[in-house]
């Protein structure tokens, strides 16, 4: 059709969202299906890569079928208690978020497909809900009706090819009929669907709050029961900071707590500034890795030449009697092995100097640094005003952590439950509380600046991959893209989502590093802070900025900032296609690729070119670390998108449901069979998830209130306001009443469960045995272990 003055007769198939969606879906499906096929094949070929945790003794992981597809059903049928035992409490909470998302999106998708989409089709002529939020002219109300469109097309004026003349139709045709529409603040003619939008805003919001609070209760009960059965050192230990100088000694601090009569103390560890010890340990670790590398080369050379290797008595350990002899006696080896020993140059990065035996060189270095560490243990290190106190009772630790003990310093004594000993960032215990306070705010400011600065490349990409911009900057390329429907569809769907997927994949590592610089006491805290930073980055750059910058009108917007609200309200529904394409690519295309572990597989072949085969294989067989700071923000952001578009464009709910189903299966397999989660946050991650979901619900409600206001339906906007208040109050209630149960363990559960014998579950490997609260430089428990693994040949 030629007539498009009101945008209602445009039949260009290249501008059909469903056509673009089909292209994106089939591209993502091809990518995901190929990844699934390769995984099913590689899983049988390289079991040590795709299920490395099955080789660890004592885990007792459930066995999956060896067939190509039956393993998927076995994975689905693994019960929650087994998942909790195998993946840990944090892994269980992570998967529960996906289960909650599946439950919510199933309900919302049902509403969207059965009710909202037909409503959009009837009132707007578009089932996908690509509506304009701003208030159109009355003539646009008229022409937006499907019945009026049909009558105009059949009219002789249009049939004869004449231009449409409003005057010919008569001004009376545009007078709205009806009493309610004449009342200021109520929907205008053609906007009756807004009443249903308000109703479904209530339905979706209330159901989201229901699944959030029901999941919170489930997690709280499981967490209380799970932790109450434990009797580990971690569960009986508190971390205290802000100690004055007179309490920075073991005797005085113990006497102080004995005077308070809060409970019997089992052990006490004063934190000191062990910076010098950390330097020595870092050097020792470097020498051990070098020695392991060259020993592997030596074993490989011996195998090639058919020479027997040295006996296991040449393992190096600082406590062995051999170290009492001189380095020359220790490093003496039979002459026939000299030709197998690798040689290195020690001057100027290994470029100049005489070649010497690498094993002898680094063995001497290791011996020397071990002696330095032994001597450094007798040094007197300054205290840092912090300490770990382990009580004999878990209940005592829980009470002390929730009690205001004293105000000995300006900020008072601060007591909290201690992280696991193997999760502590010891170098952050060297700095005082004021230093941590200012350092934390400085990193927060840096994060804020990075998020804002990142809007420049994100906004530029959003503009330059727009067809209007391409036509203006490169007319020939723009015409070529217009003439090729498939290329046009790729530009509108696959290319933008692929580019932004790369941004989404890179940013988590930056924000995890920033969190590590914040001075936090444990890696678990760093993970939680990384989740918040990355989520804020995704919200600002991939929601707000893309909605604004995804139009060539951004330059006009910069000149007239007063039109920001009107422009944002108009742009939001028009970006629904991009977000649907993003969810399709991430869920159907990218999630299956995670199972293949292309990064680990490619790094293995690259490492084999530079390091011995044994070292590459050892890295290849080691389970990767599962980081919630990297994997959690994106699903929370996808849930935010689904919430905001749940009523405007309900089709997004269907693909959001697919995203969460595939993500649940992928992460369930990874947490049980592929990855370790060494952090120990004991399920406190749920508080972060809960508040971000409330934030998404508030954004959705504000969007719907803006829709009503910009359509001049002010009364309907005020109807949504009580729901907004109820949602905010729910978040406040969570923070004041429920959040404590996500941080502490109730005395009732402790008394009930610890009166019985500890179950085997609490003795499992997944209970995250923490060791003792001693700096690694003073921990003698690992001294008898060989420094290098000579069995890797």
UniProtKB/Swiss-Prot annotation:
Alphabetically ordered keywords of this record: Calcium, Ion channel, Ion transport, Membrane, Transmembrane, Transmembrane helix, Transport, Vacuole
Stated family: Belongs to the CSC1 (TC 1.A.17) family.
Topology Lumenal: residue spans: 1-21, 117-192, 466-493, 556-577, 668-687, 735-793
Transmembrane segments: 22-42, 96-116, 193-213, 445-465, 494-514, 535-555, 578-598, 647-667, 688-708, 714-734
InterPro entries per the UniProt record, alphabetical: Csc1-like, CSC1/OSCA1-like_7TM, CSC1/OSCA1-like_cyt, Csc1/OSCA1-like_N, RBD_domain_sf
Region spans: Disordered: 759-778
Entry GO CC: fungal-type vacuole membrane; plasma membrane
GO MF, any single term: nucleic acid binding
Cytoplasmic side: 43-95, 214-444, 515-534, 599-646, 709-713
Protein name from the UniProt record: Calcium permeable stress-gated cation channel 1
Pfam families the UniProt entry points to: PHM7_cyt, RSN1_7TM, RSN1_TM
Topology in membrane: Multi-pass membrane protein
Function in brief: Acts as an osmosensitive calcium-permeable cation channel.
Compartmental location: Vacuole membrane
